[in-house]
Amino acid sequence: LGGGMGISYSDKNKKFNYKKYSSAIVKFIRKHKVKIIFEPGRSIIGDTGTLVAKIIYIKDSGSKKFIILDAAMNDLMRPALYGAFHKTLAVIKSNKISKKPYEFVGPICESTDKFITLKKFQELKEKDLIAICDVGAYGMSLSSNYNLRPKSVELLIKGSKIKVIRKRQKHKDLI
């Protein structure tokens, strides 16, 4: 079984009820005497990853602002691939709210190089850091070198210890 044990990608979604789910599975196993194999995927590692991106440019289009990040669809394919939602936060909090909606996009010239559009978000400026949450499942495993973009560094953080578990690629690594 897989696909049913997701994670909550927004504050609006309810947390998965493992007790209710396991109770139904146990009942089914006892009745039908079958073996069930689980693929829990996202429920185990989905919330263990965060993509941190820097704002490289802000483009005001009149009705909204495009927040262009140094991360792109090659770093996190889920929004481009199937419109997946990932909670997005400013790393440094501010109480000033933008008067215009923000569309968070990557620097690749593709219409699908888009992470999220938010109607209400704090004021941002170039070089601010943005955290795109819950990318532990299918974040790095779906990443690619599309458009000759090097893959980003991957860090493991445990308490106050930080360890590089994958070095940032360089363009020479791609050739």
What spans do the regions from the language model cover?
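Glycine-rich beta-strand-to-loop/alpha-helix junction loops that act as flexible
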Residues: 1-9, 40-42
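Extended, folded domain segments that form the structural surfaces/walls around functional sites
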Residues: 7-36
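Charged (often Lys/Glu-rich) extended helix/loop segments that serve as interaction or gating elements
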Residues: 24, 33-175
